[in-house]
Amino acid sequence: MRLQCVVLFAALTLVAATHAPPNVKTVLSAEQHDIPVKRLLRPGNPAGKEDEERGINFSSVPGFEKLANLLKPKPGLKKLLKWADAKKPPETVFTRLRLDKTGTQLFDNTDFPVWAAYTRSVAQTDSEASAVMLKTLVSRYSDEVLSGMIAAAKKSSKTESIATKLETEQMRTWLAAKKTPDDMFLVFKLNKAGDDILSSPLLSAWTNYMKLSNKENPKAQTTLIATMTKHYGDSGVSQILAAARKSPATQSTAKRLEAEQVQLWLKKGRTPDDTFTLLSLDRAGDDLLASPQFNTWMKYINYYNKENPDEKTTVLAKLMTHFDDEELTPILVVARKVPSTESTAAKLQAEQFKNWLSADKSPEEAFTLLQLDKAGDDLLTNPQLTNWLKYTENFNLNKEINEQVTAIQVFRAQYVDDSRIANMVIAAEKVPNTQAIAKRVEDELFKGWTVVLNKPDDVFINLKLETVGENVFESPLWSFYTKFLEKYNTANPGKEQTMISGLARGYNDVTLTNMLLKAKEAPSTKTLATKLEDELVQYWLADKKLPDKLFGYLELKESVDGILTNPVFNVWLKYLNAFNDKAPVKKALMIDTLKSAFGDVAVSNMLFAAKKDPGTAKVAATLQTALLSKWVLEKKTPGQVSAILKEGAGADVSAKLLATYSAKFKVRWG
């Protein structure tokens, strides 16, 4: 028993050295101090006072007192020697040391190394000691829990050695019990770890056992990737590895397993179509490209092509075996809106467009497939529009196409009225990110109008400017129209059109005249309105409108009262003067129009009233003189004129004017 005591003392000395506070010096082993081993300890004699009788005087060993103090208030060295002398089973000592109360913190307890040392002292070999310890631990902990504790203990320098020995012994027992790696995968509940499996502390223990099992059972070898696939499926494993690649701690392992997964598929002869289904990508929907499994699948196609050059394929070709254009295109459209999938989607869409061009798929069909027909007023902010415009350009490059398709043709068919398209352009021009596409669509629209419409006036109507009314000059569509008109006139010298032409097409004479008069009152539109008023006069002249007719068109016949102060009358008068300047031989007289419209009495009364207003007195006097001259030419007798004058003017005024008329009449007719 003397050797056993020496071993125990030496082991405890090592424990003391390992777990002592910094100020406690290391206690040397018995061998280092040449402890005499003269005879075995007698059973039942405790260490201490009778040490010398045993041949081992522990009290005289340097460091003994420090070791004894370190073990307080734990069972002292003497008690341990007594237990060893009495051949107390390690399991009993485990309980005496209250290690059965430590739970999963067993390896952190300072009494655990004491127990380990005790067990080693009573065992014949290290291997036997490990087996005895494991037996004790297995009776208290499940394989899963104990393996986790051992894995944690291996990370500490204080417990690494004993934990490694326990793990080795644990695996020997599993092998003896014919437990497969798959059995232990379930025991460790790694089948439920999900995305955390690669960071699980139990994975290391399982991997070690797998390697040991493979060595012992070469005909039943397995791998981590094969076992994971069995429990999680190809799709689940791919998802786990994608998540693991994002963590620095598991990134390298994930990459290695991905490579193994690919090799596993190749070994099993999986085709890209097979793996597409295995990874559940056929059920991914619009999020297909965002699926972690999609990247795995694309990589597999590359490996597959290298291994099978005669069956070389592409990602798009394989996608088209699972989706038609109506299904795949929306998936790519969605993916191009997401930064993480935009690049991949762009490449696939470019390849898709090539296929469409080869199949002579029309721009109209492409417009619908790209879901641009559902964009509404957000068409110009849709990122797919640029791609579609490029496709349309490439489509028109095909020399076999009989008739080219312009973008604006498709737009107009989709949106029906040009005003909606124009409003979208106007809105997009205000946003920096869409200014370029807005300019492009604007050019397409202008080009389309020039080709399709007969004249610019049609554009005014197409933009529905005839419905705006007196605020037309403040409408963004008016500016859009005038911009087109300017470009049209520049491109068609000699065929220039005026702004008034479209206005006259959309509004009648009186409405347009009143609109211009209203616009002249606002500082922001005064200059434009004045210019347009002059253009309107010229437009009427070109249309050869007779002053009398225009007088009616302008609704001036409604009332003679205050007509000389009516702004519309002044516009008519401007036209009358312009008309007479253009036809000097046969001039139209204002008085004739007034007489025709209101009659002698009404005109006479109006002139009498107008002469009383300083603002119209002068023109009224001129018109009154013209009226008298007209009556003379009509051979109205002074009596007839007297009757007319008496209805409106005062007696004195009538008498004076009648005298003037009588003199004129006498001079002309005698």
Swiss-Prot record:
Motif (RxLR-dEER): 39-54
Role this protein plays: Secreted effector that possesses RNA silencing suppression activity by inhibiting the biogenesis of small RNAs in the host plant to promote enhanced susceptibility of host to the pathogen during infection. Interferes with secondary siRNA production by associating with host dsRNA-binding protein DRB4. Inhibits the host salicylic acid pathway during infection.
Disulfide bonds: none
Residues carrying covalently attached carbohydrate according to the record: 57
Segments annotated as LWY repeats: 127-217, 218-308, 309-399, 400-492, 493-583, 584-670
Domain notes per entry: The RxLR-dEER motif acts to carry the protein into the host cell cytoplasm through binding to cell surface phosphatidylinositol-3-phosphate.
Pfam family, one: PexRD54_WY
Annotated compartments: Secreted; Host cell
Mapped WY repeat ranges: 79-126
Range of residues in the leader sequence: 1-17
GO CC aspect terms: extracellular region; host cell
UniProt region (7 X 93 AA tandem repeats), positions on chain: 79-670
The protein's name in its UniProt record: RxLR effector protein PSR2
Similarity-based family: Belongs to the RxLR effector family.
Source organism of this protein record: Phytophthora sojae
Key words of the record: Glycoprotein, Repeat, Secreted, Signal, Virulence
